[in-house]
Design a protein with these regions (language model features):
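ATP-dependent carboxylate-amine ligase
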Residues: 322-325
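His/Asp/Glu-rich metal-coordinating catalytic cores
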Residues: 2-70, 75-289, 306-320
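Conserved two-lobed SF2 helicase motor
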Residues: 293-302
Length: 325
């Protein structure tokens, strides 16, 4: 069979049966590309299990075909399996993603002592060729900056993979989906659409993230003591609004929890999270500041939950201010 006649194969290894473990193989003859490498956090019916990984045995068995890994955005359900996969691969494979996503991945890999990964930064409008598979990237709006969708072309067909998205017309960072690029690719032809379908059966539209801001401002302004606000540590748009509300009410910001500290640092260094240095204080310095002048940003759900431990009495309030907690 000639290269031109090689079939295009799409092999989902995770992500289609729930939230988490996103990993999809795109294979064309001697070439293979992996889209995302995420993990899933266990539910209450899985005691003793810390996390769940997709079964990527097929990737390891066909490692010589793997030309690259594309990561659509920086959430754990799309990046969390990368350290484990890279440790199991014999060769360094290039990882393609946006600046912020690569920043988050770099921090995660450092925890596993994976040094000098082959990062390749891409953005909306970027084009790459990986063997007989070519990929165009376009921006998507999500709860995290730097989210990308991909348009894949091969001799045997075209695939559009949206990544996770939220059609928000007033996003916090002003970056809307690249409708022009999506329209262009649609006109070129799409043989298979792989689309985010979270809450697709729920009627109506998801409200804009910008609508959260006024409520945060009001709650934080009127709270009589310390305010603890829980969020995913990668939800940079939400964190920005928390910081804005804290500053508007004259409160200092305390960041607590390992993942929250890491992600806020990376987002600030790369310019995605705008906080004045004077508005942040170290968790060890809170005792000298009145309670009504403090906002604590902590994680609140799934495998990194600081707030859940607080709510169930598993940690004291002061312990929650341990920056390594």
């Amino acid at each position: 069979m000639t290269k031109k006649n090689q079939p295009l194969r799409i092999i989902p290894l995770g992500g289609l049966d729930g939230i988490g473990k996103n990993m999809t193989v795109v294979e064309c003859g001697p070439d293979m590309v992996l889209i995302d490498a995420g993990l899933m956090f266990p539910d209450d019916s899985q005691p003793g299990i810390d996390l769940v990984l997709p079964d990527y045995t097929y990737v390891l068995e066909n490692e010589e075909k793997l030309r690259g890994i594309i990561v659509t955005h920086g959430h754990e359900d799309h990046t969390g399996a990368l350290p484990y996969l890279l440790q199991d691969l014999n060769n360094k494979v290039p990882i393609f993603s946006s600046k912020l996503t690569l920043g988050f991945i770099e921090g995660k890999l450092a925890e596993f002592r994976i040094r000098s990964p082959k990062f390749r930064e891409v953005k909306s409008g970027s084009h790459i060729s990986l063997g007989c598979i070519s990929v165009d990237f376009f921006s998507m709006t999500h709860s995290i900056p730097g989210a990308l969708g991909v348009y894949i072309k091969s001799p045997q067909g075209t695939v559009m993979h949206t990544g996770d998205f939220k059609l928000d017309q007033t996003p916090i960072d002003g970056v809307t989906p690249d409708y022009a690029a999506i329209t262009k690719f649609a006109k070129q032809g799409v043989d298979l659409l792989l689309s985010d379908s979270t809450n697709a059966t729920v009627p109506g539209f998801t409200k804009s993230e910008a609508e959260v801001g006024p409520t945060l401002n009001e709650v934080i302004k009127n709270a009589p003591g310390r305010v603890f606000v829980a969020s995913f540590s990668s939800h940079i748009h939400r964190l920005q609004q928390i910081c804005n509300a804290a500053k508007a009410s004259g409160r200092k910001i305390v960041v607590t929890g390992r993942s929250m500290l890491t992600n806020t640092r990376v987002a600030r260094e790369l310019g995605y999270l705008k906080i004045d240095e004077a508005d942040i204080i170290d968790a060890y310095d809170v005792n000298g500041i009145p309670d009504d002048k403090i906002v604590v940003m902590c994680t609140g759900s799934q495998g990194e939950a600081a707030l859940r431990a607080l709510a169930y009495g598993q940690r004291r309030a002061q312990d929650a201010l341990d920056p390594l907690g």
